[in-house]
Amino acid sequence: VLSQRTDNYIFHDMSVTDIIADVFSDYGALAEFDDRTSAAYPPIEYCVQYRESDMAFVTRPMEDFGISYSFVHADGSHKLVMSDQNMQVDTVEGATRKFITLSGQDRRTEECIHHFVPERRFASGKTAWKDYNFKKPTAEMHAQKEGTASYEQAGKELYDWPGRYMELGQGQTFAQIKLEAHEAQDKRCMAAGNSPSLFAGSLMTLTDHPVGARNIEYLVLRSQHTFTSQNYRSGGSGGTDSYEGQYELIDSAIPLRPLKVTPKPVVQGPQTAFVVGKQGEEIDCDEYGRILVRFHWDRENDQSMRCRVAQNWAYKQWGGMIIPRIGMEVMVEFLDGDPDRPLVTGSVYNADAMPKYALPANKTRSTWRSNSHKSKGFNEFTFEDKTGGENVFTHAQKDHTTRVLNTRTARVDKHDVYSVGGNRSVE
């Protein structure tokens, strides 16, 4: 049912499990779940569900944080179980299943395993992430983990960018989760038998196998149950119904993490949004000049995370700084197309916020005009490029201060008009 609803929604400062619980809460009994995770998941500053189903949205962060899920079925109901350790899932009824070799038409009424084949699969044994934190621009952010597999080519590395973390410790956790997810693709066991009570996401201990090392506890990854009724076979009536089960197992001592297979939505190009902020303010920014915006697709009147604002120049105590003000329509890009990483790159006019000088009548005029904070004044710097009417105009709403550390040169080829309405002092 979660695949039947798509949404655009913003979550602020919530852990992955809290976000999932919030989504599930809209479905009532249809999304009954049991959170058995034990890890302390950090709050995520900003997480966007962007043009994706609820199912995809909750699955994606589970894969990021290494949370597995399975279902427990009962008469007339089912429950989703979330776990981040194998021991957190249920043990099957009876706990153990004997290995019994069958021959011919031999059938057993007791639940057992009669076919068991260990398999090996090639899996990468090294993972690496890298990311960048603008609050710590020189910090080491290269996270890497390596497994213990000793076979040839086991050291092939899975490297990707960005890792979507702000601290190296979190990056190391993500690298470990990714490593465990790929290592868990190896050492699977394929089994068959008469055990209809085995279900995906349960624990079972095998006994009586002639190879002693195989008599251990397993996590059931997949179970396929086939029932055949003799009453429906051609030319026959009555007879004995039969059952055959196929199971995929893994040693329960091997951490099981889901592979990252759910694609993260990609924002295709820039969007516009309106600047928002504190009630009664015109300008709302933090120490980095970051602002808040509200996207047009947002139906909850929510706001984004603090977004950095691109400037024409930016470096240590020099460069440019213009803070977009509340109500402005701004252009927003997304780093790597990630809806969780907005970046304001400019601003645009609209029908409710038109330029000072009407267009196209003043198309030769280039203007930079500000607005006095919580007032009606302005500062302005304008170039008029109309042939024969070229002009550079400046307007200071209050004071105009010029500081020259060496020589000041002024050359006027014709008239120089200097008018002072008050006092003029020369020091």
What are these language model-derived features?
Residues S3-R5, S70, D90-E93, S124-A128, ...:
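Short helix/loop capping segments that flank catalytic or ligand/cofactor-binding pockets
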Residues Q185, A191-A192, V261, Q279, ...:
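Short, solvent-exposed loop/turn positions at domain surfaces
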Residues R5-D13, I44-V48, V261, Q311-N312, ...:
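Second-shell loop/turn segments in exported
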Residues M14-Y41, E45-A253:
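Extended, domain-scale alpha-helical bundle/helix-rich regions
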Residues V1-L2, I10-S15, I20, P137-A143, ...:
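Carboxylate/His-rich catalytic cores and anion/metal-binding grooves
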Residues A253-P270:
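Short boundary/loop segments of OB/S1/cold-shock single-stranded nucleic-acid-binding domains
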Residues F71, M82-S83, V267-E427:
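Structural signature for extended repeat/solenoid scaffolds and their inter-repeat hinge/linker regions
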Residues V1, Q85, Y232-L256, E287-E300, ...:
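Short solvent-exposed strand/turn elements
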